[in-house]
Amino acid sequence: PSGKVVAIIKEKKGKLWLNFYNTETKENNRSELLYFTKVLDMSYSPDGTKLVFSAVQKGQSDIYVFNIRGRNYDQVTNDIYDDLYPHFTDAGNKIVFSSNRSNDTVGVDVKRNRPQNNFDLFLLDTYNRQQVLTRITSTPEDETQAIPMDSIHIAYLSDKNGVVNRIV
């Protein structure tokens, strides 16, 4: 968030590396990400102390919060649904993301709750850590790549008209 340190995911020879590059000192600090097969997307928390990832582990994509100082992570979703494009809200206590989940509960029985063919937006409270998410959209179209604009508005991509548009 300060613009001084850039976080970069690098894939090299089958391994994943998280690089922090300081633009002022030109220093590069890297750590191997052993737990993940692939990191699909990531973004900083507003205070710059955490990263939120959409990452693949054992063939499923879930949301993880990485503590930069401690170099540890916390898995916040763990189910068969595709959880993509996570971003912290401007207060940093919630995460907005896209998912093909058919309900608003984390870790539900797959036999009764099959994944949808489209992506909706969901909000996850990182402090209360309840198993229930807040569903933001519920449409037959895809809503993806949500970015919180402020404490009320979220911009996202939607293919509602057959063409992908940015909606606020």
Task: Describe every region a protein language model picked out.
Residues 1, 7-19, 32-39, 52-64, ...:
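A flexible loop/linker signature enriched in serine peptidases of the S9 family
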Residues 2-4, 47-49, 91-93, 151-152:
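Short coil/turn segments that connect the beta-strands within blades of beta-propeller domains
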Residues 21, 65-67, 148-149:
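Alpha-helix C-terminal capping segments
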Residues 21-28:
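Surface-exposed loop/turn elements that mediate protein-protein interactions on large endomembrane-trafficking
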Residues 26, 68-71, 130-131:
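Secondary-structure-rich domain cores
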Residues 43-45, 87, 147-148:
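Conserved beta-strand position repeated across blades of beta-propeller domains
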Residues 70-93, 151-153:
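Generic detector of contiguous secondary-structure segments
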